[in-house]
Amino acid sequence: MALPEFSMRQLLEAGAHFGHQTHRWNPKMDRYIFGSRSNIHIIDLSQSIPLLHQALVKVREVAAAGGRVLFVGTKRQASDPVATAAKRCAQYYVNHRWLGGTLTNWRTVSGSIARLRELEGVLAGEGQGRSKKELLQLTRERDKLELSLGGIKDMGGIPDIMFVIDTNKEAIAILEARKLNIPVVAILDTNCDPDGITYPIPGNDDAARALQLYCDLIADAVLDGLAAGQAAAGVDLGASVAPVEPALARELAPEAPAAEAAPESAEG
């Protein structure tokens, strides 16, 4: 595989260049705005393209090193693309509601994940010995935990990089990542604050096609990184083993005749 490719045409067709109404802008985004049309800000995609490429390179690098990538997008139109993309590349996601302390209080969150697994085990066994009322309560508790923690229950620790759609809605998640020095890749619409975003990507954060494109590209970068990491491990293994074989061959070669002769002398 190779780093996923994308074009200006793809971004335009997805509507990535359409910002918000001009009166809803964040002045800090001024440098990424090309102009306005019908009171709608137009994002300068000539800047978005190299920034998106830079972000994909970083995501690939993290995945190649075996790092965890967390997709975050809890608003309605981002929920499905985020979950689908994360699952496709065997990574993690939060797509319903960000629980405060998800990253900064991981120990407590781990306890909730343990409870979720316990409930899954009980309900998988059909809750033998429990009343219908108890089972209903347990099912509701499980479903509630699954919504918030289902996408991170296998993460095993804090992520190494986080991909975010809508920095305004996910402000708490971004603050937690910053406290822990976790790099943040984020889509920045014209009403967003770019401060504190490690890898900013100016683009529309509402259009369904745009969100799908971003998520697909990030997932493809992860998959490429995973493939590269496996290939590198194979090359390193071969490199460490190969030089030994000729040496062993040279050392063992003189011993072979003696070893073969031993049974003959014993028989004699």
From Swiss-Prot:
Matches recorded under SUPFAM superfamilies: Ribosomal protein S2 (SSF52313)
GO biological process terms, semicolon-separated: translation
Keywords: Ribonucleoprotein, Ribosomal protein
GO terms for MF: structural constituent of ribosome
Gene Ontology annotations for the cellular component aspect, listed alphabetically: cytosolic small ribosomal subunit
Record has tRNA-binding as a keyword: no
Domain of life: Bacteria
Protein's UniProt keywords contain Ribosomal protein: yes
Gene3D superfamilies: Glucose-6-phosphate isomerase like protein, domain 1 (3.40.50.10490), Helix hairpin bin (1.10.287.610)
Alphabetical list of Pfam families matching this protein: Ribosomal_S2 (PF00318)
Annotated family: Belongs to the universal ribosomal protein uS2 family.
Protein name: Small ribosomal subunit protein uS2
This protein's encoding gene: rpsB
